[in-house]
C-alpha cells in the first residue's frame, strides 16, 4: 500500500506539467527514505530538468539509500538534458519503482536495465494504467507515429451545430466555453479548417483569464503556452489579415500547393498531397507525428469533423450538448458522404458524462 500511496503522489505531481511539457511526456517523481518524502518534483517544460532531477535536488544527501517513485522509466540517453539514470545512480538511490516503461525507442527498457546493472532494485508496472492515461498523446505518437486526436463538437439536443444561415454563436453556454479553454490548454496543437477561419475568424488561443480557478492555480499566467494552430487550407483561402495568424505562438498551414504571399515568421507551411480530390488527412497526421506533435484538439465544422471520423483518425469525441432545439433546417453535426450501412458507422463508447453549467458534456472514446 505504501508503494501505491507514493506513486499516486508522483502521478499527481506529473499532472502539473500537462500544460507545458510538449513534446515531452508528463512525469512526476517522489523520493522516500524511512517512510518520509525527502524530495519530489515534476517535469515542467521540454529542455528543462526532468522530474527525477528536481526531486534529487530537493532530497540532497537524503537520496542515498532511498526509494524513487517515478511515473515513467528514467531516461538513459543524452537529449536536451543528461540521463536521469546517471543522476539516480550518482545519488546512491537504493530502489526505483517506475510506473511504466518508456516507449521512446531511445529508452525502451534501457533505463531500467542500466539501473539494475548499477545494483539498484528496480520494478515497474505499478499504477500503469493511470500513468498511460496521463500521457495518451506521447504514447500514441511513440507507438504508432500518429498524434492523439480529440474532436470537439458543440450541438443542440437534436444534433445541430448552426442555423441554416451559419449562425452558431453561441449554442453552448459560457461554462462550456471555459471548459473548452482548459482542454485547449492541455493540447499540443489545435486543428481547424479554412472554412471555419473564413466563417468565424477565430483566434483559437488559450485565454488565461477564461480558465477556471483550479486550472489557473496550477498554471500561472507567466507560463502560458499557446498550442500550435494548424489550418487545413487546400486552396490558400486564408489571408495574413485573419486573426488566427496574428496571435501569439505558431500557425501552421497544411496546403496542397505553395503560397507566395508574405507571412509572419511564426507561420509555417506543410505541403500535403491530395487523395481523392482532398488533402490527405492520413498523410497530414503522419507528418504532424514526425514534427513531434503529441495531441491535437480539433475545432472545425461538419465537413472536417466527418472526414476525420470516416478516416478513423479520431481517438476521442468531446461533445457539448445544449438544452435547445434548432430544427431540421439547421446544420448537422458532421458530414459523412457515402455512409450507407450501419456497420460502416464510426463506433464509440461513453467514457464520461458530466454537467457543465446548463449543458451536458459527453466524453467518448473509440470502441
List where the protein language model places each region.
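Short, basic/aromatic recognition patches
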Residues: 2-22, 141
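Residue-level signal for inorganic ion chemistry
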Residues: 10, 28, 75, 115, ...
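Active-site ligand-binding patch in enzyme domains
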Residues: 140, 150-157, 161-294, 303-306
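Flexible, gly/pro- and Lys/Arg-enriched active-site loops
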Residues: 310-348
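Zn2+-dependent cytidine deaminase-like catalytic core
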Residues: 31-130, 309
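Short gly/pro/ser/thr-enriched loop/turn and capping motifs at secondary-structure boundaries
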Residues: 103-106, 129-130, 198, 237-239, ...
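Short beta-strand scaffold segments in enzyme catalytic cores
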Residues: 27-35, 153-154, 362
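Conserved histidine-centered catalytic loops in small-molecule metabolism enzymes
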Residues: 337-367
Amino acid at each position: 500500500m505504501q508503494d501505491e500511496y507514493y506513486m499516486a503522489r508522483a502521478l499527481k505531481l506529473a499532472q502539473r506539467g500537462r500544460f507545458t511539457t510538449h513534446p515531452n511526456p508528463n512525469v512526476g517523481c517522489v523520493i522516500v527514505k524511512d517512510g518520509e518524502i525527502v524530495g519530489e518534483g515534476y517535469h515542467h517544460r521540454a529542455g528543462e530538468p526532468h522530474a527525477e532531477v528536481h526531486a534529487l535536488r530537493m532530497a540532497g544527501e537524503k537520496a542515498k539509500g532511498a526509494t524513487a517513485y517515478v511515473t515513467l522509466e528514467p531516461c538513459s540517453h543524452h537529449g536536451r538534458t543528461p540521463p536521469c539514470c546517471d543522476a539516480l545512480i550518482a545519488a546512491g538511490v537504493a530502489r526505483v519503482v517506475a510506473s511504466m516503461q518508456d516507449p521512446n525507442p531511445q529508452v525502451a527498457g534501457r533505463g531500467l536495465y542500466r539501473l539494475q546493472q548499477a545494483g539498484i532494485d528496480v520494478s515497474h508496472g505499478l499504477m500503469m494504467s493511470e500513468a498511460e492515461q496521463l500521457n495518451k498523446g506521447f504514447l500514441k505518437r511513440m507507438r504508432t507515429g500518429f498524434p492523439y486526436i480529440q474532436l470537439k463538437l458543440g450541438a443542440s439536443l437534436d444534433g445541430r451545430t448552426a442555423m441554416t444561415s451559419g449562425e452558431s454563436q453561441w449554442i453552448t453556454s459560457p461554462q462550456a466555453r471555459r471548459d473548452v479553454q482548459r482542454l485547449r490548454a492541455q493540447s499540443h496543437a489545435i486543428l481547424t479548417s479554412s472554412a471555419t477561419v473564413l466563417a468565424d475568424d477565430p483566434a483559437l488561443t488559450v485565454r488565461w483569464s477564461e480558465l477556471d480557478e483550479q486550472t489557473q492555480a496550477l498554471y500561472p499566467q507567466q507560463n502560458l503556452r499557446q498550442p500550435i494552430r494548424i489550418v487545413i487550407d487546400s486552396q490558400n483561402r486564408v489571408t495574413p489579415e485573419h486573426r488566427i495568424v496574428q496571435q501569439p505562438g505558431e500557425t501552421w498551414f497544411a496546403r496542397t500547393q505553395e503560397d507566395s504571399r508574405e507571412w509572419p515568421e511564426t507561420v509555417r507551411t506543410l505541403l500535403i498531397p491530395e487523395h481523392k480530390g482532398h488533402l490527405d488527412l492520413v498523410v497530414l497526421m503522419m507528418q504532424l507525428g514526425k514534427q513531434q506533435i503529441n495531441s491535437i484538439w480539433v475545432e472545425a465544422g461538419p465537413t472536417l469533423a466527418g472526414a476525420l471520423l470516416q478516416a478513423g483518425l479520431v481517438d476521442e469525441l468531446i461533445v457539448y450538448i445544449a438544452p435547445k432545439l434548432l430544427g431540421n433546417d439547421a446544420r448537422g453535426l458532421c458530414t459523412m458522404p457515402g455512409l450507407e450501412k450501419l456497420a460502416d458507422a464510426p463506433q464509440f463508447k461513453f467514457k464520461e458524462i458530466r454537467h457543465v453549467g446548463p449543458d451536458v458534456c459527453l466524453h467518448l472514446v473509440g470502441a
